[in-house]
Design a protein with these regions (language model features):
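Mid-domain catalytic core of redox enzymes
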Residues: 209-335, 343, 352-356
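Dinucleotide-binding Rossmann-like beta1-alpha1 core, especially the glycine-rich loop
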Residues: 12-94
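Active-site/ligand-binding neighborhood in enzyme catalytic cores
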Residues: 49-51, 60, 70-72, 81-218, ...
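Conserved flavin/dinucleotide-binding core of flavoenzymes
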Residues: 10, 65-69, 284-287, 300-433
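Glycine-rich FAD pyrophosphate-binding loop
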Residues: 1-12
C-alpha cells in the first residue's frame, strides 16, 4: 500500500528512504521505466534531512551521533560514547540460537542502552512493534547474518557480502553520485501506482477494481478458480500480495497446513496524523525523531515533512509534520473495544507536536488515517513459518507465489522487490511442472 494525498495546501503521505543496495537500484529502474525521472524529488546526502535524526528522551530531542567524531564523544541520551559499544561488540562471541528477539540480540552485543533506546525506537518506527517480541533474524537479517558469518555486526557490515549485479540508468547514476537518502515524487507518492496502472493497462493487462476475492479453489486440471463474489475467473498461477492472514482464509481445504502457517503471521494497526501549521518553525532541522516505548507508549515518532520536501508545502506554504501513533497504547485501545475516533487521534497527535516540537498553536489543516492491521509483525520464529510455507508449496507443487509485506520486509522498497521476484519465479515455472 502506498498512501499519499496531494492537495493544494500540500502533499501528505509516504516518502521513501533511498538506502544503498540492490533494492534501491531495482526501484530506481522501475521509476525510470514508468517515465517518472523528472518527477523525482531527492534528498541528497548533504541535506539536513539526510544527516540529522533525533530521539525524544526525557522530554528532550537528542541528535543521533553520526561520523567518527560523533561516535568518539559522549552523545546523550547515551551515557558513554557509542565507540565503546562498538569496541565491546567486537569481543562478543557469536550467538548460538537459531533466532533471538531484537532486544536480546542488541543487549547482548551492544549493551542495554542501545537496546532500550536505539533498537526499541527503531522497531517502533519501522514495524510499530515491540523489540522484545520481534525477531532479529527476520526484521534485521543483515545484522543476524553479519554475526553468523563474521562473528561481529561491525565486521560483517564492513566486509559485506560482496557486490551483486545492479541495474543502471541515468537516475540511478545520479542517485549514487549525490548519495540520495530518501525521495518522493512531485505530485506525491500516489503518482507511482497511478503510473504503474497506466503502464500495465496500455499493454493489455486487465486491472479489476472493487472486486474482492472471496475464495480460491483448485480445479481438476490444476488451475485456480478465483471467486469474486458474483463472478469468478480462472488462473494458471496466482501471485498473492494480500496479508498472510487474509490469504489463510481464502485457501482451499487441501492447503490447510499452509493456511495454518500463514494465519499466525499477525499485523498491528497504526494511526497516521498529518498536521500543517502556518507560520510555525521547528526547533531542529532533520528527517524526524523516534520515541522509545519508555517515553510515550502512544507516539512512535514524528517525521518533519517540510524539511525534506519543502516543494510539497502547498500555497501558501505551511510547516508539515506527520505523527505516527500505535504501539501498546493503540493495541490496548483495540483490545478494550474503545471507540477509535479521528478526534482521539488528532488530539493525541497535536499534544505530541506541542510537547515534543513546541508547536502549540492549533494546526491549519489535519488529516487522520487509521490503518488497521497494516504492518506485519515478524515475531520470534518467523523464519520457520516461511520455511514451512515454502516446503508445502514445493511439495504440493501449488501454482501459488507469496509476495508482499507479510514475509521478508515491510517497506515499500521491500514490497517492490518482493513483487519483482515473485514475477520472475512465476514466469520461470510452467503450470503443473
Amino acid at each position: 500500500m502506498v498512501l499519499s494525498l496531494n492537495l493544494d495546501r500540500g502533499e501528505f503521505g509516504r516518502r521513501e528512504p533511498w538506502e544503498p543496495g540492490h533494492y534501491l537500484w531495482a526501484r530506481g529502474e522501475q521509476v525510470s521505466e514508468l517515465g517518472l525521472d523528472s518527477e523525482v524529488l531527492p534528498v541528497k546526502g548533504d541535506h539536513p534531512a539526510a544527516q540529522n535524526r533525533f530521539l525524544y528522551v526525557g522530554g528532550v530531542l537528542y541528535a543521533l551521533p553520526t561520523g567518527l567524531r560523533g561516535l568518539l564523544r559522549p552523545s546523550p541520551p547515551f551515557s558513554k560514547p557509542l565507540f565503546w559499544a562498538g569496541l565491546r561488540e567486537l569481543t562478543k562471541p557469536r550467538g548460538k540460537e537459531a533466532d533471538e528477539t531484537v532486544h536480546s540480540f542488541a543487549q547482548r552485543r551492544l549493551g542495554p542502552e542501545v537496546a532500550s533506546l536505539a533498537m526499541d525506537s527503531l522497531c517502533r518506527g519501522v514495524f510499530a512493534g515491540n523489540s522484545r517480541e520481534l525477531s532479529i533474524r527476520s526484521c534485521f537479517p543483515s545484522l543476524f547474518q553479519a554475526e553468523q558469518t563474521h562473528r561481529s555486526i561491525l565486521l560483517g557490515l564492513l566486509l559485506g557480502a560482496g557486490r551483486s549485479p545492479q541495474p543502471d540508468s541515468a537516475l540511478i547514476r545520479q542517485a549514487r553520485a549525490e548519495r540520495w537518502s530518501q525521495w518522493s515524487l512531485r505530485g506525491g507518492m500516489e503518482m507511482l501506482p497511478q503510473a504503474l496502472d497506466t503502464y500495465l493497462t496500455s499493454r493489455g493487462v486487465s486491472v479489476l477494481r472493487g472486486q474482492p476475492v472471496s475464495g480460491l479453489s483448485l480445479q481438476t486440471d490444476g488451475r485456480w478458480k478465483v471467486s469474486l463474489g458474483d463472478s469468478s475467473l480462472e488462473a494458471d498461477h496466482v501471485i498473492s500480495a494480500v496479508p498472510a492472514s487474509v490469504l489463510s482464509e481464502l485457501l482451499p481445504a487441501e492447503a490447510a497446513p499452509l493456511a495454518h502457517a500463514l494465519k499466525t503471521i499477525t499485523a498491528v494497526s497504526v494511526a497516521v496524523v498529518n498536521l500543517q501549521y502556518r507560520g510555525a518553525r521547528l526547533p531542529v532541522q532533520g528527517f524526524g525523531h523516534l520515541v522509545p516505548s519508555s517515553e510515550d507508549p502512544a507516539v512512535l515518532g514524528i517525521v518533519y515533512d517540510s524539511v525534506a520536501f519543502p516543494e510539497q508545502d502547498g500555497s501558501p506554504p505551511g510547516l508539515r509534520v506527520t505523527v505516527m501513533l500505535g504501539g501498546s497504547w493503540l493495541q490496548m485501545l483495540e483490545a478494550s473495544g474503545s471507540v477509535l475516533s479521528q478526534e482521539l487521534f488528532q488530539e493525541q497527535a497535536q499534544a505530541a507536536a506541542a510537547t515534543q516540537l513546541g508547536l502549540k498553536e492549533p494546526p491549519s489543516h489535519c488529516l487522520v488515517h487509521l490503518h488497521k492491521n497494516c504492518i506485519p509483525q515478524y515475531m520470534l520464529g518467523h523464519w520457520q513459518k516461511l520455511e514451512s510455507a515454502s516446503q508445502f508449496l514445493a511439495a504440493q507443487r501449488l501454482p501459488l507465489t507469496l509476495a508482499g509485506a507479510s514475509y521478508e520486509g515491510v517497506a515499500v522498497n521491500d514490497c517492490i522487490e518482493s513483487g519483482r521476484q515473485a514475477a520472475v519465479r512465476a514466469l520461470s515455472t510452467e503450470p503443473n511442472s
